[in-house]
């Protein structure tokens, strides 16, 4: 503490913008400044990330890249004795290369300035705030970690709502929200069309999205009429949700037909589709072109539609294989999730942001 005090006084006397201490510093991939040798060097980053934790800063830079999203700039600022989170946030909100801002923060030095800066930043671009120390025990941990005195959670939550920030609880939720912000159209409503491969999964995906506060409405009469012309109801259903594996049977023309019909439905604001590794992996492995055609069809639909579209691909027993094909989805800018619950939670957060 004594050394930190001396360092702070020296920096302020010299008008020196000190990062940290107790941090990893700056990650600037475009110019090759990295936290470690594993961090990618890229010039197409769109995410600005701020972290009071060095580990979370490193983890975010690595895992976001593994999910097809690159960082424009990242600052690990630790104890923030000279430059605080508000200084970095102010920079990122004015940075043309940064489209989305995320942060992990345990506490702030100047609450009023942070509130005003965050509110202005949220007017310019989406800001996702992952707060550390949300519980009494967690707040004690932040004090020993970065010396941050956490504000009461109710006060913090109220400030986030007033500013229009998107709040998350962990790294996965933060990344999931960013997938949608960077790779889908903005939602205009909460009416979901849900497309599953089997009956059981159609129930599970419906429960997941309904529990997240999203609607699974009846389709318009015209939609039922059009689907009824060709849909196989033996072991399937074209209610909402759809149980459609027996109808599609690997035909991209049929999938395209279904997607076009649902896209035209006025009751549908967005679509979420399950791809089943449990059933499809064998075919994709044997005929890789079938996977490529599936991704191409989804990408084409996503491009022509004005409605958000997301894909859920549970690894099942094919975790290693699914991990190997994820870059194909990322390259096509398809937001890919490994569970119904994560997809639903992310969509609900982005929808709430759009309505704030």
Show which residues each predicted segment covers.
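Catalytic-core regions of core metabolic enzymes
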Residues: 1-356
